[in-house]
């Protein structure tokens, strides 16, 4: 900790990686800010995991970009939670998919909202399934529509219930057609009312049969006429 920031910056990467975890934790935030991208990129996974939450929050966005997938995967849940929205926003997709489910759940809702569409689309189905309902609600509509059909199907019923009417109304016809029957049954009546004619027309017969009576009752007449004959026949008596 007695090293000046100038001395820290002067450390060669081979010398920096030789530091023990206690020595790494002894670096103050000014030292962390001063580290070059080459120095940060050279840190071992053990050193990364040893960083304090204050040190993690002090990493510059360029330094986050310099981290590899294995380094990002070494972050603890506390470290992930300490990341700023600016830091989360620059994480490369190849590194984002390296995060474990616990790490994904540690992302704050503000961080989820800060993610770009490409980042959200890169999430694996396992990561999507691990999201909390609060995180799912925090997804911006433009990011939600970037999800592939497998990712949409990975949302659990609690997530579907938690979706806002704006989010449901923004789903593409392809995404709507990919919903499981359990997900369809979990849609709230206000969400069903938010669906447009083209979205309702995308429902499969199995999905139509899975609708609850409350959901059917929430359909607008203009949307009902968009439903195909097979879908109408699938409605339970």
What are these regions (language model features)?
Residues 1-237:
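General marker for long, soluble alpha-helical cores
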């Amino acid at each position: 900790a007695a090293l000046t920031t100038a001395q820290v910056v002067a450390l060669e990467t081979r010398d920096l990686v030789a530091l023990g975890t206690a020595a790494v934790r002894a670096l103050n935030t000014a030292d962390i800010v001063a580290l070059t991208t080459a120095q940060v990129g050279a840190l071992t996974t053990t050193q990364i995991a040893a960083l304090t939450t204050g040190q993690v929050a002090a990493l510059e966005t360029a330094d986050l970009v310099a981290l590899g997938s294995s380094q990002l995967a070494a972050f603890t849940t506390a470290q992930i939670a300490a990341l700023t929205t600016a830091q989360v926003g620059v994480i490369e997709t190849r590194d984002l998919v390296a995060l474990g489910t616990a790490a994904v759940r540690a992302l704050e809702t503000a961080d989820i909202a800060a993610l770009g569409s490409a980042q959200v689309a890169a999430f694996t189905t396992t990561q999507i399934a691990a999201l909390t309902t609060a995180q799912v609600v925090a997804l911006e509509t433009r990011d939600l529509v970037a999800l592939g059909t497998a990712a949409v199907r990975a949302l659990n019923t609690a997530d579907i219930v938690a979706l806002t009417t704006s989010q449901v109304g923004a789903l593409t016809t392809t995404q709507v057609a990919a919903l499981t029957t359990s997900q369809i049954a979990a849609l709230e009546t206000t969400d069903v009312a938010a669906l447009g004619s083209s979205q309702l027309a995308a429902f499969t017969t199995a999905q139509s049969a899975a609708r609850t009576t409350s959901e059917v009752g929430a359909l607008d007449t203009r949307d009902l006429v968009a439903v195909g004959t097979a879908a109408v026949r699938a409605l339970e008596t």
